Amino acid sequence: MESQQLHQNPHSLHGSAYASVTSKEVPSNQDPLAVSASNLPEFDRDSTKVNSQQETTPGTSAVPENHHHVSPQPASVPPPQNGQYQQHGMMTPNKAMASNWAHYQQPSMMTCSHYQTSPAYYQPDPHYPLPQYIPPLSTSSPDPIDSQNQHSEVPQAETKVRNNVLPPHTLTSEENFSTWVKFYIRFLKNSNLGDIIPNDQGEIKSQMTYEEHAYIYNTFQAFAPFHLLPTWVKQILEINYADILTVLCKSVSKMQTNNQELKDWIALANLEYDGSTSADTFEITVSTIIQRLKENNINVSDRLACQLILKGLSGDFKYLRNQYRTKTNMKLSQLFAEIQLIYDENKIMNLNKPSQYKQHSEYKNVSRTSPNTTNTKVTTRNYHRTNSSKPRAAKAHNIATSSKFSRVNNDHINESTVSSQYLSDDNELSLGQQQKESKPTHTIDSNDELPDHLLIDSGASQTLVRSAHYLHHATPNSEINIVDAQKQDIPINAIGNLHFNFQNGTKTSIKALHTPNIAYDLLSLSELANQNITACFTRNTLERSDGTVLAPIVKHGDFYWLSKKYLIPSHISKLTINNVNKSKSVNKYPYPLIHRMLGHANFRSIQKSLKKNAVTYLKESDIEWSNASTYQCPDCLIGKSTKHRHVKGSRLKYQESYEPFQYLHTDIFGPVHHLPKSAPSYFISFTDEKTRFQWVYPLHDRREESILNVFTSILAFIKNQFNARVLVIQMDRGSEYTNKTLHKFFTNRGITACYTTTADSRAHGVAERLNRTLLNDCRTLLHCSGLPNHLWFSAVEFSTIIRNSLVSPKNDKSARQHAGLAGLDITTILPFGQPVIVNNHNPDSKIHPRGIPGYALHPSRNSYGYIIYLPSLKKTVDTTNYVILQDKQSKLDQFNYDTLTFDDDLNRLTAHNQSFIEQNETEQSYDQNTESDHDYQSEIEINSDPLVNDFSSQSINPLQLDKEPVQKVRAPKEVDADISEYNILPSTIRSRTPHIINKESTEMGGTVESDTTSPRHSSTFTARNQNRPGSTNEMIDLTSQDRVNYGLENIKTTRLGGTEEPYIQRNSDTNIKYRTTNSTPSIDDRSSNSESTTPIISIETKAVCDNTPSIDTDPPEYRSSDHATPNIMPDKSSKNVTADSILDDLPLPDLTHKSPTDTSDVSKDIPHIHSRQTNSSLGGMDDSNVLTTTKSKKRSLEDNETEIEVSRDTWNNKNMRSLEPPRSKKRINLIAAIKGVKSIKPVRTTLRYDEAITYNKDNKEKDRYVEAYHKEISQLLKMNTWDTNKYYDRNDIDPKKVINSMFIFNKKRDGTHKARFVARGDIQHPDTYDSDMQSNTVHHYALMTSLSIALDNDYYITQLDISSAYLYADIKEELYIRPPPHLGLNDKLLRLRKSLYGLKQSGANWYETIKSYLINCCDMQEVRGWSCVFKNSQVTICLFVDDMILFSKDLNANKKIITTLKKQYDTKIINLGESDNEIQYDILGLEIKYQRSKYMKLGMEKSLTEKLPKLNVPLNPKGKKLRAPGQPGHYIDQDELEIDEDEYKEKVHEMQKLIGLASYVGYKFRFDLLYYINTLAQHILFPSRQVLDMTYELIQFMWDTRDKQLIWHKNKPTKPDNKLVAISDASYGNQPYYKSQIGNIFLLNGKVIGGKSTKASLTCTSTTEAEIHAVSEAIPLLNNLSHLVQELNKKPIIKGLLTDSRSTISIIKSTNEEKFRNRFFGTKAMRLRDEVSGNNLYVYYIETKKNIADVMTKPLPIKTFKLLTNKWIH
């Protein structure tokens, strides 16, 4: 019955070409994403009808008909079973999958559905389902892979398939599988399934539908019995029985491998090489083929490989055939070397062929007669033959030889010959090295040339060869000029000999010339006749005069040829010859020097200026022009770099013609920022239209008065100097030109003001191009000279002088010549920035040096002198008394300039001017100098500070002209997380200068610190003081009684880490150690050269710098013992606020109360004399190599925030020298690395589709993910995420508007499984979103504050979740996404309507949407300054994306908000919070236990228990629990880390995971770990074994204390006020590069709500500065929190700040307006005073032992760590 139905309705079932058909359902094996049509939602069911071509019938599938695929016809009689295929995968008639939301990848179980095909597939047999036509296996058939391209693709509009498609034969044996699979692939391609078949690279053109997959699976099963499959195929199918595509892909790969061997042999046999590609590329290609054959066990011998290569050589490489023809032991490497040699030689010659010679096609008909010395015939040759003329051999030129000395009248030939023959070195020249390429034009077909032969030319007087391969004894050409019959010059590179070895052993040699500029190699019969050799053209031989035959000659075409096999090769790879013309160029000036002297002008301008005599005392012939046109000045490349060339003719074409100086162009440039006030910030330029003469004037501002003064000056100058009147001035429409003042000025003088018109960008081209040129020159000159930027206008001035003196490419004269002025006298010009010595006419004393180092800038406008910059005086002077400094190492030398030394050349050029200066200096005494030299008047006076204070100057020390020896210091390797990505690591090692305690200062509790200077200045002062009375090299004695008198007895000192040091006795008993150190020691204080004794002070306590205002030694609070914690900050409203009220209820450790007079307390208040040189660590940060302890660390000189100034008198009084080590640079590539440190990559917790569903072996979990998948799809369609009414073609949409998408899956903390369809925002184009929009979420401090207030006020806490929150927000931009895979619309796009998750703008759109709804519909208001915190009179809401936390005293108020939200959003109540018992929440990762009116506990035990074991960190390896996250005294070794790159990346990734999780936990509630997390985060990119161990130790401590919680208790109801307190602390200089660690803890009503630990952004120079920095970081956040608390709770608030630094409190308290030494920290201190007094903030002192913020700044011993944390986290 069933069979009859099949025959009656052949279209009812499809794809049944398999062994048997069963209708028995196996539910466990259905596809997890398959749903029945009856259960399909209405909107989904409609979506499947898109583009449907026909309606379905009860007998067909609900899937639309696909006219591009076919399948076998069903069969009434099932074929035999084909083996072990799983029969539950067979297609059943009643299992048509309608919805088919399946990914194109293979499901684990195959369910078949109907597949619409054409009845014309093939003629089915009623007794057997498969065609009877089975071609025998022995029948040869074309390779289906090779014939695939023969089948054209079926057009999209085609609705019928090919008729009579032959199915593949059935597999008969395992050995025939490779043959069978070819027919099977061809069968699929003929069935129009080629797009889903993988190619040899494993790629597919289109995604496979479920029906296509089922069809392939069933046909493969039908034609390939399982027991006949190869083993490797069975292994694939055992893993996934339906993975047929993998089998096909590997089969194609195996076929490609089998075909590769044949392809390699074909490629090797057909090798061709003519030099068009590089020899290296050819060698790599051949070697790759041979190596691939070798891997297939096919060995190709060198002899065979050489023969195959030689067979394919052509062009200049042909001669290798003859050379290797007789060799039996050919080596492949030798052949490659010969090919490389010829290629390099041809490359050099091609690069040096000149292009100025005429082509051969320009030659005329020439009749040439052989010389009388030979018996050769006369030949006539036509060089202009037509296309119909008979092909001829190579041209034979009439070549004549002439000597330079005999052709004195032929100047142009002599000059061209001379200028093209310069040597690249003084001693040798490479043949063809300096010639330019000029490819010869072949007027004769190249096929007429007889390869490897010389053309015998009877008309040539010289033998010419193109290759130097046969040239012996080569020397450069210096005397001979060669011309052809048309008297055109032929450049000759070299002269040598050709050696012949003829048949009978006769050897001879003739003279030959080498030139690449001929068509063929020419053998002169005249040269042969000189050797008694003649040519017999009747017998075609070369013969001696006695008739001996030497060699045969061959007639080819119309000419005779001699084989090159008789030539003896020279066998040299690079011919070098002596420079015979060296004496002619030895006195020439090198072009780089002239280029620098003339302001880095271009080659053409300089050459043209010299030809026009625009520059005097210098001729064009005096300059070495070799490589001048191709010379690349590195400074020009950097300084003149432009985007593109200026458009020619950009100036207005309708400009009228004016006389000189009647039409001016002007423009203003500026401002230039970050300059001293005395330096100009602008300049205004003028250009004359006629002469192009240029003027520049400096400007400090753009005020009307300044501009008017310049115009007055320029007009007066032109009128008096050039007797001309300015008629028109062209300018732009800037306000400086269009103001009324200037307009009136022009009107009164009858000058036309010509302004640019709207949108006319070309009208002002002259002035704009001038400014661009001047700025290019300015940048180049400053970069080349290395001078500071404040001299920028001097560079512009120099450039203007040079530009006025040079001829521009468009003019025949320079601007000076056009203006009637004399040319530039080059003897008056020095290179910009040339080091010079200027005479000092007024030294400090008669024995002081008379010379001051300086740098030449430009000639003076107002005198005959030169403007010199004196860095030591920070002035520019106008003087003629200077001497060029010889062999000065400066910035000029860093590019080497072809290793040229310009001192001698510079002296010769300036000899005339120098003699004038020397003559003046000889005749005049120092007292008779000019007035300008006496006064050193400066146009720009930068600063009036003394020389000794110029620490950042780039100048040369006046008294130390020799280059200082650089002492190399190994810099530590570590990562500074706080360094900006645009900065470089500090490059200076800090000083270790012992600091002297001043008597007067110590009586007030302060110290005087000796300031740090640079090594350069310190050595200068030492040199000065050594010869002065009373100077000494020894340090001052620090053991005197009057130096220390402030109770330094029995003081117990500790290291930064807390380990104890021995007691220090009274001053008389203090041990002062001395050691010998160098004045500039290295980092480990090794001594060298000069020595001095340095005291080592072994006293450590906290230091107070002398930069703070004086603090009373014995303030009134200290005199009374009744105030252990005195109120340091009195206030008018503080009558009821005391220290006890602030400290009350704080979780401080319980300590025995000690009076201030106790020794330990005294030591607490005594300023530290300071610590040791630090390295980097979690602990004391000490460096074991450092043996010196100093009182105070100084910040580096490159930290510009603090400028330490030391006068000369201070140094003379102290008789001290700087001990600062030399600067060293740490060369670590951190620019990209720092970004990684700042943004730690989180651990990926989501799964991809294949991970969650396709290959998920956990069936239960997979089912949950499938359910979540369908739920997400339904939600997307329900929310109208995209426009389903229209599909867009991909080719019609701008690609940047197309957004990629994907599905991600994850398991939430509550155990639910979630699927999310997200956009790939990480690759979203910037034009598709507004970068100014921000996605805001609630700040963690705001959440903690809200929770704390809720606990104190018995609030109800309700937790909500809004499903698919982003989908409620519309998008404004026009964006498109690719449809989900189930739709099968690969070339279509959908218009996006909603803010899909992952888009850049989705977060901001949702924030604006929900904010508007809460304000308008829920009567809420957002708290100012705290985004995502909303409140009204009853409810407070904290919003974090789609999570909402509601706080209210009345639960009904929360319910009312929920009801309002549900009207608009799908709102889910996670926890209503109505129970009076303990309620557990999971809020933003925090596990909270809350019982109203009692307590709140915050922890992450469940999360840490789940996540920590997944980090692959060994937990509890010894079975012991850690009691502290780190111990003091552990130091991170900063030696360079040598590690493999892959291992390095792996360890960095591991560090990112570990520190990322630790940071998440630390900033949530484990504030006690923040110091360790912050320190280790700085070393993420330095994953040494030590750093990893410390990180493991931190993770281990987190595991051991995972059950710890942040405990809060309800505030006492008797206290009506809210109390907000910040506790601050700083650890001075315990971070790398002397940075200080600062920390703050914030408490609300005694509950810790936040903490921060970070490295100070500025380098502090004392403990007080570090404490001030910490307090300044705490107060702004304290004020913001105060505003939030007052908004959320209307109770009065008391704000307090606690610190353990009395000096910081005194500074805040002080009203002294005395100027601080450090302006940066002085500014901070003054701001603190204003904030404290203006915000009613109470500042109190807290003992260090009670300061819980101490855990944020340093590692502590276990006992101390527990003592400070056990009150608030346990």
Curated annotation (Swiss-Prot):
Domain Reverse transcriptase Ty1/copia-type: 1353-1491
Region of interest called RNA-binding, as start-end residue ranges on this chain: 295-397
Tagged with keyword Iron: no
Chain positions recorded as Mg(2+) 3 binding sites: D1625, E1667, D1700
One example GO MF annotation: RNA binding
Single GO BP term: DNA integration
Main function: Capsid protein (CA) is the structural component of the virus-like particle (VLP), forming the shell that encapsulates the retrotransposons dimeric RNA genome. The particles are assembled from trimer-clustered units and there are holes in the capsid shells that allow for the diffusion of macromolecules. CA also has nucleocapsid-like chaperone activity, promoting primer tRNA(i)-Met annealing to the multipartite primer-binding site (PBS), dimerization of Ty2 RNA and initiation of reverse transcription. The aspartyl protease (PR) mediates the proteolytic cleavages of the Gag and Gag-Pol polyproteins after assembly of the VLP.
Designated name of the protein: Transposon Ty2-F Gag-Pol polyprotein
Organism for this UniProt entry: Saccharomyces cerevisiae (strain ATCC 204508 / S288c)
Primary gene name: TY2B-F
